[in-house]
Amino acid sequence: CGGSTSSSDSSAAANTGDSDKVITVGATPTPHAEILNAAKDALEAEGYTLKVVEFTDYVQPNTALVDGDLDANYFQHTPYLNNFNKENGTDLAAAFDMHYEPFGIYAGKTASIEELADGASVAIPNDGSNETRALLLLQDAGLIKLKDGIDPTSDATKLDITENPKNLDIQEIAAEQLPRSLADVDLAVINGNYALQADLNAAEDSLITENPDYAKVYVNVVACRSGEENSDKIQALKKAMQSDDVKKYVDETYKGAVVTVF
């Protein structure tokens, strides 16, 4: 509603080559860049050109945003963003919520949790908030016990394990390397986006998925520089990305491995 007016005005501005009508967003390839591309037509109707810059790690999208090379990024959940700001003294903000991706435990050399041998190897992500998430999932699976008070907002590590009855060898690995680690470890706890890139679906392929209440704590957000949340570009991006068409695309494409929250 009201879109046609802003669309015609914006299109006229875009035809003049106005760089303010180009929205540059950094994203990891799956599902983030794919979801962004599903919103391109809606942005074009509003007179904006969407430029998606793909990254394969979790650091460069934020540093590029801080440096002004991007208008926004879309790859991280709120606990990771908060932790990044804390560790780097940056001031990035969550502009709006998009989706969550359930973590899963996947079979590597061992086919099931019940078959795990004493001393079996388990790979988990090595960055703070995602390591916490993985450890909580291992606890839910009955494989370890963590110190009292550890919850999804904590910054837990292996040192917070108080009981490890199977003497699991828990290996901290860069999140993007986890799918490749499956050939070398008994189990791996894998982030939803990297699982999808490896053709793994948490809802269908994992041995166990995380508690939905925990998963919702890790809502993936579109982030921008603090103070720009209400800028024309960010608001146009929000309108396009939180559309019914994008929701339908996510539901039909990812079949429960990506869950929208709008």
Regions found by a protein language model. Name each.
Residues 102-113, 218-231:
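A bilobed periplasmic-binding-protein/Venus flytrap-type ligand-binding module shared by bacterial periplasmic
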Residues 18-30, 48-54, 121-122:
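Short, well-ordered beta-strand elements
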Residues 132-139, 241-261:
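Periplasmic-binding protein-like
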Residues 66-76, 120, 143, 165-169, ...:
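Alpha-to-beta junction loops
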Residues 95-144, 247:
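A conserved helix-loop-strand patch within extracytoplasmic ligand-binding domains
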Residues 83-95, 109-110, 184, 189, ...:
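Ligand-binding "clamshell"
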Residues 1-20:
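Bacterial lipoprotein signal-peptidase II cleavage site
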Residues 52-63, 151-180:
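Short helix-initiation/N-cap motifs at beta->coil->alpha
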